[in-house]
Amino acid sequence: GAGIAVSSLGHQDPELLLAISEQASKLWHTSNLFLTEPPVRLAAELVDASFADRVFFCNSGAEANEAAIKLVRKYTYLEHPEDEREILSFDGSFHGRTLATVTATSQPKYQEGFGPLPGGFRYAAYNDFEEAEKAIGPQTRAVLVEPLQGEGGVNPARPGFLKHLRELCD
């Protein structure tokens, strides 16, 4: 099942319905164990339109965020002690329902009942330049941020906030 984010696709868009029915008449789903043309084509388009040279497809936002968290942990495992492998997230965020993404989500209502939660996460106020500056330090290895928070009340990042985070990370 897909999450609520798919609602952004609208309702019965003719172009989307046509694409879905054309694909359904060919092949539905094969998992990532088989190479098929549509994801290969999409991967090439994503690489061409971005800074990346690789693509990792996931089934959900939670799975994508979990993979990002694991990548950070694995990448920093040999180079940094455990207390210097922190991931910063923001109040009002929602990153998924896996154990790591629930922990990255700084909302107790989603974390309650799942303790003890994994360590290595820190939280700061969303859109607060000064608090972000205080939170990001030598122990920070990643910043997990939503440009537009949905669960927190449809809160867009203030102008310059994401750029400021990027500068702090550099």
Regions found by a protein language model. Give the residues of each.
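Residues at alpha-helix caps and immediate loop-helix transition turns in enzyme cores, especially N-
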Residues: G1, Q12, A157-F161
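Beta-strand scaffold of nucleotide-dependent catalytic cores
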Residues: G1-G3, K134, R166
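Short glycine/serine/threonine-biased micro-segments
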Residues: G1-G3, S8, N59, E66, ...
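Glycine-rich loop-to-alpha-helix module at the N-terminal edge of alpha/beta enzyme cores
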Residues: A2-E82, E86
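Active-site-adjacent loop/helix segments that line or gate small-molecule/cofactor pockets in enzymes
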Residues: L33, A125, D170
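Surface-exposed amphipathic alpha-helices with a cationic face
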Residues: R73, P159-D170
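PLP-dependent aminotransferase-class I/II
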Residues: P81, F90-Q149, G153-F161
